[in-house]
Design a protein with these regions (language model features):
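Bacterial N-terminal signal peptides
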Residues: 8-20
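N-terminal Rossmann-like dinucleotide-binding module
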Residues: 24-77
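C-terminal helix-rich "cap/oligomerization" subdomain common to oxidoreductases
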Residues: 28, 98-100, 328-372
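Active-site loop of classical SDR/Rossmann-like NAD(P)-dependent oxidoreductases
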Residues: 41, 291, 312-324
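Conserved SAM-binding strand-loop segment of SAM-dependent methyltransferases
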Residues: 80-86
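Beta-strand-loop-alpha-helix segment that lines the small-molecule cofactor/substrate pocket
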Residues: 98, 104-105, 109-156, 171
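Predominantly a Rossmann-like dinucleotide-binding segment in NAD(P)-dependent oxidoreductases
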Residues: 156-246, 363
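Contiguous beta-strand/loop segments that form the cofactor/metal-binding neighborhood of enzyme cores
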Residues: 219-296, 323-335, 355-356, 372
């Protein structure tokens, strides 16, 4: 099952009502959320989506930069009273139930540990963090304080990826043999990301690497989900910088090979694609499927049959958007378990990325050890 939903009659009725458009979720008090950080460009997506939903109430925004606070206040016509320079100042007055983190990836551990001390659930942008040591520290804090830590990926909300997962679960593809995942775009500078976003994306101390971490995490997340949380046996990676004049400190192209018992995944994160892409190919013993984009699939089940194009069914609420999902988790209506956003899945993702970075550095294949 994609997400494990608590099996009680009221919650089943709520899910049915939400999917039918009756607005029952909207009648529940919205979850009080605060934004931490404005230096991650994905915050704009939240601010655009926020007025169109009823699951979350924005009660505060924290960023130490007065210039960034003023920029977003003006651009989104936000109440100046929402803005705070520190998390402590916000917590003293606003009492959020959950935090949405839009800082550099390198700041995630510190913020999650602070949130855990206040028993606040957290959703961060992908990836979870920049090193396995940090990921394990985050897991310790979450377990000690009994909080949920979720990782938001655009591809989690792709109906096509859910359809691929369901095909695997139903056995329609047979046993998985090879998965090829392409993620990336022309480059952050080339597509015009905000200056504050570009500054830390190209700093290995804050982003972990370049394209290797920025887009390698998508494929690692999907493959870990497809493999029911299992880590690969080995990780082999090659990175290069094809545009050193733009990205002198980090890689802009990578290939990562994950070896499992009986299967292999090839992840191709890059800041050098001709166009933006997030597509996945899965090859099994009975069939193959390509998730072309967020909704479209190409599938084929025998050598003699032609490839067919199909549209994936839409995701049901509350599995359809990040805020809908977050609200359900905070309300204890949904348990992330070992799914795409879950902490357990994403500790494995960081284990893969950490090993890939080491493999690229040394030129050697890295054998993974069991997590503590």
């Amino acid at each position: 099952m994609f997400f494990r939903i608590v099996r009680t009659l009221p919650l089943i009725l709520a899910a049915i009502a939400a999917s039918s458009g009756s607005g029952l979720y909207a009648q529940t008090a919205p979850v009080r959320v605060a934004i931490i950080g404005l230096e991650h460009g994905h915050v704009t997506g939240f601010l655009h989506a926020f007025p169109l939903q009823h699951d979350a109430e924005l009660v505060g925004i924290v960023d130490p930069s007065a210039a960034l606070r003023a920029k977003y206040e003006a651009e989104y016509h936000l109440d100046p009273a929402l803005f705070y320079p520190t998390l402590d100042a916000l917590l003293a007055e606003r009492h959020p139930e959950a935090l949405l983190v839009y800082t550099s990836i390198g700041e995630h551990r510190r913020i999650i540990e602070e949130a855990a001390a206040h028993n606040l659930d957290v959703m961060v942008e992908k990836p979870l963090t920049i090193s396995l040591d940090d990921a394990l520290a985050i897991r310790r804090a979450a377990r000690e304080h009994h909080i949920q830590v979720m990782v938001n990926y655009e591809t989690t909300w792709y109906a096509s990826n859910r359809a691929v997962y369901d095909m695997l679960q139903q056995g329609r593809l047979g046993e998985v043999r090879k998965v090829v995942i392409h993620d990336g775009h022309q480059g952050p500078k080339e597509i015009g990301v905000q200056p504050e976003f570009l500054q830390w994306l190209t700093d290995p101390a804050q982003n972990g690497a370049g394209a290797l971490y920025d887009f390698g995490c998508y494929g690692a997340d999907l493959m870990t989900w497809f493999m029911h949380g299992a880590a690969p046996i080995t990780v082999t990676a090659v990175t290069q910088t094809d545009k050193p004049q733009i990205y002198p400190r980090v890689d802009d192209d990578a290939t990562i090979i994950l070896r499992y018992s009986g299967a292999q995944a090839v992840l191709m994160p890059s800041w050098n694609w001709t166009f933006g892409r997030k597509d996945t190919e899965v090859y099994g013993t009975k069939g193959e499927v390509v998730a072309v984009n967020s909704t479209q699939l190409r599938e084929r089940f025998s050598e003699s049959s032609p490839e067919e194009s199909v549209t994936a069914p839409p995701l049901p609420a509350p599995e359809d958007t990040s805020l809908h999902y977050l609200a359900a988790v905070v309300r204890h209506q949904l348990d992330p378990g070992h799914d795409l956003t879950s902490l357990d899945t994403n500790v494995v993702v960081v284990q893969i990325l950490d090993a890939a970075r080491e493999s690229a550095r040394t030129g050697r294949t890295v054998t993974l050890r069991p997590l503590p």
